[in-house]
Amino acid sequence: MADSGSEDIAVIGNTDLTPSESQNNLKNTMVEKGTSLLKKMEISVAEAEKRTGKNAVNMQETYTVYLIETRPVDAASEGTSPVPDSLWRRYSEFELLRNYLLVTYPFVVVPPLPEKRAEFVWHKLSADNMDPDFVERRRVGLENFLLRVASHPVLARDNIFYLFLTEEKAWKETVFETGFQAKADSRLKALNATFRVKNPDKRFAEMKHYGDELQAVVSQLLRVRARAADRLYGVYKVHGNYGRVFSEWSAIEKEMGDGLQSAGHHMDAYAASIDDILEEEEHYADQLKEYLFYADALRAVCRKHELTQYELETAVQDLSSKKQQREELATGTVRTFSLKGMTSKLFGQETPEQREAKLKMLETQIEEGEEMVKDRNVECEEFVKGAWTDIERFKEQKDHDLREALISYAIMQISMCKKGIQVWNNAKECFSKM
Amino acid sequence: MSNGGTPRSLPSSGQKSIQEICHPLSAEESARSRSPDVLNPGEKDLSLPNGTPVDTSSPASSSSLLNRLQLDDDLDAETRDLFVTVDDPKKHVSTMETYITYRVCTKTTRTEFDLPEYSVRRRYQDFDWLRIKLEDSQPTHLIPPLPEKFVMKGVVDRFSEEFVETRRKALDKFLKRVADHPVLSFNEHFNAFLSAKDLNKRQGLALLTKMGESVKYVTGGYKLRGRPVEFAAMGEYLDMFTQKLGTIDRIAQRIIKEQTEFLMELREYGPVYSSWSSFEEDLHEPLEGVSGCVSNCSSALEELTEDMSEDFLPVLREYVLYIESMKNVLKKRDQVQAEYETKLEAVVFREDKKTPMPTDVEKCQDRVECFNADLKADWDRWQNNKRQDFRQLLTGMADKNIQYYEKCLAAWESLIPLLQDKQDAKGETN
């Protein structure tokens, strides 16, 4: 069953995608139906559930699982809407999937997961991971993540991703069988080491700089936004106090009483309206947060490019030093001061046989080195090509998404203003009748 | 000296509340006739023919009274014949002191004034002088409050534009209230204040009231026997009202504080969009647009906050002082009644002598009733003023908030096309 399933995916991922279509996908990269995997199946994270169990060190822990539902698009369009396939996943499994994608597709700006812990919160918003609002926002975020991967021209075809959606039990083993973990470890080590590229690619350097700036500005924006939300909340809620005092005051008035009383109700309504407003604004904040994390993904790609470039440069340097050694050995001259030169002076010349053997060894090493440089060159070129394509795709997606986010933010502000005008008009009518 | 004419016309209206409301509000004539008689005992007879018809006509028509009450806003405006404004504050610096004077302009058709128009300059202490004079010469009346003299030093700059403007508004309100009062507006000190080139502040110093004497009767916690329920109710009302105003004042202050802090965040929030826009290509304009929009909203918010702290709070505080003035009048009334009750008791103790009630006690009774009538009239006038003032104040607050939201709305609505434009164009080329 599992086998035939994995057969299927390979087919799903690759068929029907003519080059022109995939080209189209590169351009039209928004999370929409009609792109790659989403053409075949509907994906949703339908609900979240709290569970309790034992963790690795046998400690009792509470965690949240999310229900992933998939159903073939064809069936849905025919109106038969069968029971969707569904399975439960934990956040940590999403993380595992993303890590796998990061290692396997180093040239892709991998869609980020929603935040692990609530950040940039204002006081009314709970930072508790078990908070229902937080869980709900994360559910939406996880669904968005799946849709983004499913609509990505490269990632959508991944076998492991398909299994993530369809195979609850066997999936984890399959991921580890890919051996990505080992690769991840060595990559991580290499990435953490400090290295300096001699000839950095200007485009990637700029893109990395852009990622830095984007991350800095969006996090600042989110910080100030959270503080402003706190203040706005205060402004509205304090108006609610008018509601009470007007009502009390109305009790000692005759002609003014009715007007005051009803104006008080409008003040109550005004104070209550901020809850919905800020809840909506939180959605905007989540959209910004996605790009805050996207900035990190973008920087990761640039960093991996640097590493690839560095590996190429190291190979080239290695080769040229081998070549230099060969030259020295062949001509017997030592251009620069070296240990070898010293030893030869101290212990006399090597025998011709020895030299011959050394030369031979160097010869093979140079051959290997040349092969290596060639490979690295190809690797680097491919990386640049793939990465740049994906970065272009990402840029377009980003411009589109953020523009949409700004529009919905503006619309939200407009509706808030309209609500404000309405409430104050109502109150004014009451006041003018006093 | 006011015991001659007025008390004779008042007793008949003494216990009937409808008439009492009617009396002060009814017409300028009755008011006009009464004030001279306080000042000029010689003319007291005039009050009789004018006062009596009102008294006899009123008991029948409580409905006509209602009509009058409803109409009185308009009536006031139509019959007003004394217009006073305070404007043009000027700073004077001398070696001795620095102070502000305000121009007081008067337009009137009243014959008590020699000229139809006056323009004089007065400083705060002149206003203060006037208020003391009014309080002394019209002890039975509610004298509107002046803005507080002492402001916390260091916290408020006494010569700042905002402070002077707030004070000017309060002084203007004070004079207008006096000018609209059917009795106070005929006070000679008021006349002098409005018209005299130089205020002779010594003038009228001798005119000390008899009311002052009755203070001694209330010392030692004398308890009134027969304080009419309505006055007790007034006191209770004022206490409650003070409390509510205090709460409203605190709420308004907190809102201003929250708004000010919100404004500070917005001032930081807008520019972040701007710095973001600096390194985006396609998003440059939209982000710049949002930044501008937030900045517009900040300005609108700043205006709202300023309006609230300069127009809303001072009026609230003035009303707290107004209530204090009213409480003072109530206290004075109690004192006058206390004097009467003490004297009456003394007489009752020697009841057996069967002598007629001494005129002294009768005079006292007259004075109590006169005071009651004046107070009730002022109370109703005050209630009416208060209703109008708060209607205006709260409607104004609603208006300011509406304006604020309308400005923000306009800013965000004008942003939408800017956000959409390029996208549509792109959609077409795709």
Curated annotation (Swiss-Prot), chain B:
Keywords: Endosome, Membrane, Protein transport, Transport. GO terms for cellular component: early endosome; early endosome membrane; phagophore assembly site. InterPro entries: AH/BAR_dom_sf, PX_dom, PX_dom_sf, SNX30_BAR. Residues 57-66 have a biased composition (Low complexity). Disulfide bonds: none annotated. A 1,2-diacyl-sn-glycero-3-phospho-(1D-myo-inositol-3-phosphate) binds at residues 123, 125, 153, 167. The keyword Membrane applies. Its main location: membrane. Residues 80-201 form the PX domain. Involved in the regulation of endocytosis and in several stages of intracellular trafficking. Together with snx4, involved in autophagosome assembly. This is Sorting nexin-30. It comes from Danio rerio (Zebrafish).
